[in-house]
Amino acid sequence: MADAATITKLEEGFKKLEAATDCKSLLKKYLTKSVFDQLKAKKTSLGATLLDVIQSGVENLDSGVGVYAPDAEAYTLFSPLFDPIIEDYHKGFKQTDKHPNKDFGDVNQFVNVDPDGKFVISTRVRCGRSMEGYPFNPCLTEAQYKEMESKVSSTLSNLEGELKGTYHALTGMTKDVQQKLIDDHFLFKEGDRFLQAANACRYWPTGRGIYHNDNKTFLVWCNEEDHLRIISMQMGGDLGQVYRRLVTAVNDIEKRVPFSHHDRLGFLTFCPTNLGTTVRASVHIKLPKLAANRDKLEEVAGKYSLQVRGTRGEHTEAEGGVYDISNKRRMGLTEFQAVKEMQDGILELIKIEKEMQ
């Protein structure tokens, strides 16, 4: 049972949400009085309550989603809130649906989407993973952060071939290394106000770090928003090469570190928007003609379930007609299907851009 102080805070938070008529978050939409009453006293075995789930969305009324999972059990215990939010965000992933088993498919189906190098500046595929047996950020202790980091760094130090590289702990990092990682756009900063409010940045920078291979085409973030963010990237449009590298790495790491997986929801992550495959495949792409015809761009993007963002990611503008375009769907389809959908969409965008020139 949640304690009285927590329940009081929850009641206040619920009142604040109810009063916020211009709040458009999925939290506000689905945290009805009956769902609230059903969940307010519940507590996971690691001690997480509904307050841990909703506090970021209560503090930041401009959130798009507004909920985070403090631990893996939260997705089950607080499912009357999570399930409708998941269904709404991952369009069409119904509460009776089951995410398919992991399937990276035939990696040779992926190609260089821009062999002439005229449109695509860079290509990146990432996934998120949580380590089994550990809660997510808000419930982690300082000792757990350290323990996880040592498991991750020793696991990664065994990677070979193209993936061989160096682990840099954020704790005690020298200014030189820090600057170098910033210049390479590798360094992650302490969380934004949404993550701060979710208590995702405690004991910072303990247990946080960055691994990269010698070529700087493979990157692992340890204990940023998720336990692990595994990233493969390079300049140009060779999606095939980027995808193959990621798949090799994930399969290798998985042999040594068991990941949290849910029968219905797939791979578990801190934020429900990343569940399922957790895969985000993206390109930075120059589309000057389509940029001038935003409706056409959005129409094609919609057809292939692509998300169009500004150059520097979420909530930014396109600089010089350069967009960050990625797959939108992560749940209810396989890893292969998610990336294939993105490849098909990018090829179509390039074809249309060429026709408009």
Swiss-Prot record:
UniProt-listed GO biological process terms: phosphocreatine biosynthetic process
Residues holding L-arginine: G64, V65, G66, V67, Y68, E225, C271, E314
Alphabetically ordered keywords of this record: Acetylation, ATP-binding, Kinase, Nucleotide-binding, Transferase
MF term (GO), any: creatine kinase activity
Disulphides: none
Pfam family name, one: ATP-gua_PtransN
Record-annotated Phosphagen kinase N-terminal domain positions: 9-91
GO CC annotations, alphabetized: extracellular space
Domain Phosphagen kinase C-terminal stretches: 119-356
Binding sites annotated in the UniProt record for ATP: 122-126, 185, 229, 280-284, 309-314
Record-linked InterPro entries: ATP-guanido_PTrfase, ATP-guanido_PTrfase_AS, ATP-guanido_PTrfase_cat, ATP-guanido_PTrfase_N, ATP-guanido_PTrfase_N_sf, Gln_synth/guanido_kin_cat_dom
Residues annotated as signal peptide: none
Catalytic activity: L-arginine + ATP = N(omega)-phospho-L-arginine + ADP + H(+)
Modified residue annotations for N-acetylalanine: A2
Enzyme Commission identifier(s): 2.7.3.3
TM stretches of this protein: none
Family the UniProt entry places it in: Belongs to the ATP:guanido phosphotransferase family.
Protein name: Arginine kinase
Organism, scientific name: Carcinus maenas
